[in-house]
């Protein structure tokens, strides 16, 4: 990645800069499967091998206009980019190409409203050509039990994102507040659908531009109480996503909402110990529409709470208790509740710390979890280690 700074002018707080450069990327991918009866012999069927080369050449011109006065900042970047991407299958000699010229502006503005309150506004437009791992004719082992194949044209994404935020900082009172909102419009040149056959997953693609829209609101409040030596933080997220996907070869509109709040409290006031509690509440909802008719409505609600307490019995001897509580349920009659309890002792002797812990005292042996996405519902059963004891030694020199 090389660039040349061809112009740089400064006048007081105003600065203009232009850069001319070229960026190149080269990726090589080779994959195959071995014969299970003889690991030294590779299976060479076309559907089981990949031998691909991917190259992208991107010449560009960056024009940046910035203004800085005290804490007010303004930065406008207007890059002009040309993309020449080629992917070649060295087994068949076939090539996939993509060429375009794009204008991808970026705007960042920071305005201090008071000595403690600041506002930020940002906009970005970006074009991305997906890499070699997003399109391949042969199957690839994506995890220990899933094979995936996607033989589409080169995937391209065009993103527009607008965001704004307010930040309040008062270190003397120990109060920090942040609010952020973000709107994104993502345009793709492929409409995707996954088909499943036991462990095989094949991605089908239709060459059609489609859009995904998302809107997020995020808030963060943190307050430290000096006298009580207590810190409280609250995080909340509200998100809405709408997109189009192929389900059973039928165009399906997907609408999802995410609501989450996290509360964390830490107390360090007492000489005999301290404690920490983290609570997370989440409610998600997904709706699917075909031909403007609702075909699915999935809702799920989860609670997760973690509580830790430490007791300092002497200057060298301490004990701790750790609990985890999970409660998950949804409209598909899935309901799981779990309670975990751990207990530990720690003793410091000269340069050695000795720690003994008993984990999973409640002796849970199976953990059931459900994964709900925009259009899929999956349930997992994990076998976990029953109640057990462990001793650790820590040495310091």
Protein language model regions, located:
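Exposed, low-structure sequence patches enriched in small/polar residues
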Residues: 1-397
């Amino acid at each position: 990645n090389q660039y040349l700074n061809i112009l740089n002018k400064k006048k007081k707080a105003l600065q203009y800069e232009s850069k001319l450069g070229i960026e190149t990327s080269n990726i090589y991918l080779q994959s195959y499967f071995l014969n299970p009866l003889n690991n030294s012999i590779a299976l060479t069927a076309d559907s089981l091998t990949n031998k691909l080369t991917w190259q992208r050449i991107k010449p560009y011109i960056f024009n940046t206009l910035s203004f800085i006065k005290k804490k007010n900042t303004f930065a406008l970047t207007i890059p002009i980019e040309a993309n020449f991407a080629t992917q070649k299958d060295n087994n068949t000699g076939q090539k996939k190409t993509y060429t375009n010229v794009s204008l991808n502006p970026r705007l960042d503005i920071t305005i201090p409203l008071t000595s403690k309150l600041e506002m930020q506004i940002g906009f970005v437009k970006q074009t991305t050509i997906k890499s070699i791992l997003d399109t391949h004719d042969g199957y690839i082992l994506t995890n220990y039990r899933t094979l995936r194949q996607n033989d589409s044209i080169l995937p391209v994404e065009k993103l527009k994102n607008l965001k704004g935020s307010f930040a309040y900082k008062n270190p003397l009172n120990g109060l920090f507040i942040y609010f952020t909102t973000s709107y994104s419009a993502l345009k793709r040149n492929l409409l995707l659908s996954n088909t499943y056959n036991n462990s095989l997953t094949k991605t089908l693609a239709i060459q059609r531009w489609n859009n995904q829209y998302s809107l997020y609101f995020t808030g963060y409040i943190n307050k430290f109480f000096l006298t009580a030596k207590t810190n409280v933080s609250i995080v909340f997220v509200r998100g809405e996503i709408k997109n189009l996907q192929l389900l059973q070869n039928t165009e399906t509109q997907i609408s999802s909402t995410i609501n989450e709040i996290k509360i964390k409290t830490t107390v360090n006031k007492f000489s005999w110990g301290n404690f920490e509690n983290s609570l997370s509440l989440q409610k998600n909802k997904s709706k699917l529409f075909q031909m403007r008719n609702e075909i699915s409505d999935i809702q799920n609600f989860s609670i997760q709470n973690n509580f830790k307490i430490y007791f300092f019995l002497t200057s060298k001897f301490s004990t701790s208790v750790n609990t985890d509580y999970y409660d998950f349920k949804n409209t598909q009659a899935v309901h799981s509740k779990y309670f975990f309890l751990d207990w530990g002792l720690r003793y410091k002797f000269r340069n050695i710390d000795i720690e003994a812990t008993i984990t999973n005292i409640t002796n849970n042996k199976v953990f059931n979890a459900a994964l709900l996405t925009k259009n899929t519902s999956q349930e997992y059963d994990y076998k976990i280690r029953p109640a057990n004891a462990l001793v650790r030694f820590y040495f310091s020199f």
